[in-house]
């Protein structure tokens, strides 16, 4: 096992993953390994995978066992078996085939590399927006693309010597003899010396330009230019002002990019590749489907294309010195395009397709998007002690509670229930405990409720865009197959009760449970973390419900007193009681809200029936300048002053005996809920102080 790479992915030592450009030396250190016989392996030089007769990996190919390790643990390519880790069996190495006797899992992380015959620009840094190479060099992207793909060249700064650009320009203006003699020079052996000395093209030209400038000088010059543009002010021309604004934004991005390279100690020339890493074989497998037909990952075919073209370029550079320069440039362009297709198929236009007109999946297609390696496998992987279901409204729940279906609850807390069954000696072992859970015995639900009483759960709704996307709740067993939520927590999750799903997780460690209780409970996250406004406010269904609850008695006594339609709200019988008087002709009078709610439960009045409720002697209820609508006198001398929404009972001496307010059962219910909530808050506050 490569110690450098294994230490890099040690999950106990490292708790983060950083993605960035890597130097050729680091790629070589990850991929190269020294065999016991002193041979260094790691470079993939052949575009082959498996031999068609023996069905074994080809030597120095994409699945070579010498580079990536054995396919079967302890078995080399010859078929000999050696016990892994047994020193008595001799060296863990087959001298005949050169394969180490190690665990086959090494093929999941042992890399290889391809030594490119020419530098290749990384297409992510060139074509992706923003183009880091174009920003750093302060050159148009189209010009850099033409340079990378060998469409034109630039002259190296050599004084008093002809340059390639001057010679190409002289073709149109020089005499006819020189027009035909100079191109012949480019097919001679002397052209190589001239080309390497005076002209530069392809990715090597980009690499030279990236390695040349000082990043601190780039930052200083960009800052000076930005200040000069800022001092100029408005030109009066809208188009020129927008152009200056775009230039200033570009300079800011350029300074940030140069600062990033300095801070991370990354050399800009790493954006041009000299060594191309080869993924471990297990991450790009070849499998056999029904009928023995092999099915390969698209990455393998793209790697083969790169190796074919790279070898085609390597042969004339190493064996023949009479190869025309234009042919070499053309082959370098093909290598660049092959690597582009491997990294990001289709970024330069039409994507590469197979024989069935199917687009090959490149590195970018494998790792990006919802089904990519990061979001699906690393970030969105399935975890234990978690479930998922549709959310519905639980209006009777407290703000910090949620209702879990029985199926989800028993599955999430199964291990805790098993421990409880064994502790209470209901079951003697795990097997018997599981059988009792499957049979759904009553004792199981009792233990489950006891376990859930002291264990919070986490609810998460994707996408988790802010911290309120994950909140903690105290679970209770609910009926049905959906997760019940208080409607006030809907806004924090940005959820709707129209089929949205939520995931539920069980925090296992004591630290996680403490964090859930102290920081993540829903009743402790009532304010928006972004702007500080209340986020647990009634919306949608709750507002409609409150409106319907209090819709009665909104036009006063004058609109309803003599309206025959209101008579259907009253019963035909006369009820005489000490607490209230109820007749067909009169609106009922109640001494307390409990009496009114009792009459509603007995269906003597409905939710919207106007009634008179005795109220405390509060002068704020009485409007001093209001004139009574009607005054009713009784035989004992007392009289009632009836106003729009209240009435005052006075004695003969005009003293106020009592006050009645005109309301409905809906208003009473709403008021009592608010009153109980305020009293509960005051009690909690007094206990806390």
Curated annotation (Swiss-Prot):
Parts of the chain that traverse the membrane: none
Claim: Signal is one of the keywords in the record: no
GO BP annotations, alphabetical order: DNA-templated transcription
Molecular function terms, GO-annotated: DNA binding; DNA-directed RNA polymerase activity; magnesium ion binding; zinc ion binding
Quaternary structure annotation from Swiss-Prot or TrEMBL: In plastids the minimal PEP RNA polymerase catalytic core is composed of four subunits: alpha, beta, beta', and beta''. When a (nuclear-encoded) sigma factor is associated with the core the holoenzyme is formed, which can initiate transcription.
Lineage: Eukaryota, Viridiplantae, Streptophyta, Embryophyta, Tracheophyta
Enzyme Commission number: 2.7.7.6
Top EC group: transferase
Entry keyword Metal-binding: yes
Provenance organism: Illicium oligandrum (Star anise)
UniProt cross-references to Gene3D superfamilies, sorted A to Z: 1.10.40.90, 2.40.40.20, RNA polymerase II, clamp domain (4.10.860.120), RNA polymerase Rpb1, domain 3 (1.10.274.100)
Chief place where the protein resides: plastid
Record's protein name: DNA-directed RNA polymerase subunit beta'
Sites where the protein binds Zn(2+): 76, 78, 94, 97
Keywords: Chloroplast, DNA-directed RNA polymerase, Magnesium, Metal-binding, Nucleotidyltransferase, Plastid, Transcription, Transferase, Zinc
Gene: rpoC1
Reported cofactor(s): Mg(2+); Zn(2+)
Coiled-coil annotated spans: none
Binding residues for Mg(2+): 496, 498, 500
PANTHER family named among the record's database cross-references: DNA-DIRECTED RNA POLYMERASE, DNA-DIRECTED RNA POLYMERASE SUBUNIT BETA
């Amino acid at each position: 096992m490569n110690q450098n790479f294994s230490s890099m992915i040690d999950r106990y030592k490292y708790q983060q993953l950083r993605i960035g450009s890597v130097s050729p030396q680091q790629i070589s250190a990850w991929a190269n390994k020294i065999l016991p016989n002193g041979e260094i392996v790691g470079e993939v030089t052949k575009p082959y995978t498996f031999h068609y007769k023996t069905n074994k990996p080809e030597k120095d190919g994409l699945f070579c066992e010498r580079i990536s390790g054995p396919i079967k643990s302890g078995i080399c390519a010859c078929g000999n078996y050696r016990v892994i880790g047994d020193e008595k069996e001799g060296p863990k190495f087959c001298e005949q085939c050169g394969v180490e006797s190690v665990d086959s899992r090494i093929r999941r992380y042992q890399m290889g590399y391809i030594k490119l015959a020419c530098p290749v620009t990384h297409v992510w840094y060139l074509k992706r927006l923003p183009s880091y190479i174009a920003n750093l060099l302060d050159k148009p992207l189209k010009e850099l693309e033409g340079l990378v793909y060998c469409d034109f060249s630039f002259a190296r700064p050599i004084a008093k010597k002809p340059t390639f650009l001057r010679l190409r320009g002289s073709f149109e203006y020089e005499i006819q003899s020189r027009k035909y003699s100079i191109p012949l020079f480019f097919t001679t052996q002397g052209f190589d010396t001239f080309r390497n000395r005076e002209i530069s093209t392809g990715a090597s030209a980009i690499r030279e330009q990236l390695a040349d400038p000082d990043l601190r000088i780039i930052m200083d010059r960009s800052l000076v230019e930005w200040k000069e543009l800022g001092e100029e002010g408005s030109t009066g021309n809208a188009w020129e002002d927008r152009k200056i604004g775009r230039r200033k934004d570009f300079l800011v991005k350029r300074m940030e990019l140069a600062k990033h390279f300095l801070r991370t100690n990354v050399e800009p020339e790493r954006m041009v590749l000299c060594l191309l890493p080869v993924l471990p074989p297990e991450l790009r497998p070849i499998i056999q489907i029904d009928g023995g037909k092999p099915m390969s990952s698209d990455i393998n075919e793209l790697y083969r294309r790169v190796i074919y073209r790279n070898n085609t370029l390597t042969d004339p550079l190493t064996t023949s010195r009479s190869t025309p320069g234009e042919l070499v440039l053309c082959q370098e362009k093909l290598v660049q395009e092959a690597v582009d297709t491997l990294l990001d198929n289709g970024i330069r236009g039409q994507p590469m397709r197979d024989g069935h007109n199917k687009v090959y999946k490149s590195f970018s297609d494998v790792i990006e998007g919802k089904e990519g390696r990061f979001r699906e496998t690393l970030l969105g992987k399935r975890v234990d002690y978690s479930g998922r279901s549709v959310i519905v409204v639980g209006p009777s729940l407290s703000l910090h509670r949620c209702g879990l279906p029985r199926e989800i609850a028993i599955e999430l807390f199964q291990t805790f229930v098993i421990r409880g069954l064994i502790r209470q000696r209901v079951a003697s072992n795990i097997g018997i405990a599981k059988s009792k859970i499957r049979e759904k015995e009553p004792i199981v639900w009792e233990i489950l409720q006891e376990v859930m009483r002291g264990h919070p759960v986490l609810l998460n709704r994707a996408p988790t865009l802010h911290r309120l996307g994950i909140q903690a709740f105290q679970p209770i067993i609910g009926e049905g197959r959906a997760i019940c939520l208080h409607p006030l927590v809907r806004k924090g999750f940005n959820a709707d009760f129209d089929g949205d799903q939520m995931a539920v997780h069980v925090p296992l460690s004591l630290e996680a449970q403490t964090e859930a209780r102290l920081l993540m409970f829903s009743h402790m996250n009532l304010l928006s973390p972004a702007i500080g406004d209340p986020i647990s406010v009634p919306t949608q269904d709750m507002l409609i419900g409150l409106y319907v609850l209090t819709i009665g008695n909104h036009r006063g006594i004058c609109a309803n007193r003599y309206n025959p339609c209101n008579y259907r709200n009253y019963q035909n019988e006369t009820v005489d009681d000490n607490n209230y008087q109820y007749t067909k002709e009169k609106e009922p009078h109640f001494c307390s809200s409990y009496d009114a709610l009792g009459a509603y439960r007995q269906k003597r009045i409905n939710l919207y029936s106007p009634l008179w409720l005795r109220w405390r002697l509060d002068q704020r209820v009485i409007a001093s300048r209001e004139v009574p609508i009607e005054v009713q006198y009784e035989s004992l001398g007392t009289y009632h002053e009836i106003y729009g929404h209240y009435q005052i009972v006075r004695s003969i001496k005009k003293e106020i005996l009592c006050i009645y307010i005109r309301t409905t059962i809906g208003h009473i219910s709403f008021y009592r809920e608010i009153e109980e909530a305020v009293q509960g808050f005051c009690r909690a506050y007094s206990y806390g102080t």
